[in-house]
Amino acid sequence: MSHFLPEDEVVLTACQGLALTYPGIGLCVEPLYLLATRPAPQRRVALVAGGGAGHEPLHTGLLGRGGLDAVVPGAVFTSPGSAQIAAATLAAALLGERDGVLHIVKNYTGDRINFALAADQTRAAGIPVAEVVVDDDLATDRAAAGRRGTGATVVVEKLLGALADQGADLDGLAELGGQVAAASRSIAVCARAHTSPADRAPAFHLDPRTLDYGIGIHGERAAHTLADHPSVDLVVTRMLDELLGHVPTGPYGVIAVVSSLGGTSDLELRIISALVHQDLTSRGVHVHALAAGAYVTALDMAGFSITLTGLAPGWAGLWDLPTDTPLRLPGSAASTTTTLAPPTHAPSAARATAPTAQGGGRAFLDELHQVAALAHTDLTALDQATGDGDFGDNFCGGVTAAVHLADRAGIAGTAALADTFRDHVGGSSGPLFGMLFTALAPSADRFPADVPALAAALRRALSRITAIGGARPGDCTLVDALAPAADALAVTPPAEPGRALTAAAHAAIDGARRTAALTARRGRASYTGYHSEGLPDPGAVAIALVLTALAHVHEPQLAGELPALPDMIRS
């Protein structure tokens, strides 16, 4: 990201890092260029590319055997100078006594001019030079200067690198490069501008509810915006609709490249790539190869591009050949997802022992469902301050999923909670609350309440949670609410008959409130230091909600004595 660029020598320092990381890459400091020092012995023609920095791993990622011979980087978003390009071209031509050099040039005015001047200088030295221009950006299809060169550059460089290693001549490589560029189109969309290296602020303002559709890789604003931030599947469909109107999709299929613009997570890219594959195959388009990653970026712009290349005979084989370069592109795509069946296992203990009668168990689940729905926003806010912000979704989503399971499978409510949290809710909340509900299931599913059995269940849950999770009272976790609740319910005989569960709920609420004064020593909140002080632990609040729901069901006449959620989380 451009938050961590040095004050000066940005590009040189990055080139030094690349050369140190990959020993097969050499660095010339003045003029600045990078050279692959271990070319394939059959290669007769050198491949040279370059352009402004900030798009990495473009160009440098394919420097090496099976890719480029030399890369010429300019300053961030600035074309390299002709002297740089000429020096790199000469060095690549002389390494292995090549028959000529092919320039791969993105269609930007500065790149076109400087590569043309360098080509003239190199030809004057007696070295043949040809040029392939990559102009794939569909958003600039009607621009006077022609389409911009963007994502298809990676495809052109990969296919030409494979053919060059087989000893192809200059004319053959230039012809293939032109054909691949003509068969390729790209389109990009962004949700947030890149960070400007000059002032470390967004390069432009984009309303968070909109997407810039057709954004350029230098931050050139798009002609269109998509309002109301449409869902990603609709965005992908629109992009493919437009691309397929310009890309040949014959019997050899297509190469599809999904590239981050620098600030898009790998999780998002995997989702987008799955949607691309699903959409294309549903249209009858064969996807020979599907690549998803950071290939052509715009510093840290939050967005992605899709590139489609319609394949001709022989191209698929070139794509599938391996490379010895910093960037490794995947070969043939799977035609379908390989779906594996889970191993068979015995029925869960909760489900096997839970009675099928609805009774208190279903009433407890329904009450907890209502309580959790009201608490969702507050639990999320608490976890955003003390953790990663997912607790509200995990806990409340788990309760909702348990309701659906109970409806569908006809099992008792607390057993459904146990199954759902243990097997389907992620993070630490899933297994921890799964242990609680598993312990409660045999007793909470009976009506009226068996207080001694519930007391024993809470004690079992507490013992199991502390043994596996490692937390103890005072660590600012759910244990700080569960332990006092278990203690309150374990009083024999009950201090106040008919009020045992309400007393346990009060104890859990008081315990949850006290966590606001504790320093977290377990869980993600322990990493946030002072940020977690003054706020109750969300897990402890959820325990208080569980005990409150249990008390509401079995001691409804006392429900008014328990505080509502806003008061519950205030110390």
Per-region residue spans from a language model:
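N-terminal loops that bind phosphate or other acidic moieties
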Residues: M1-S571
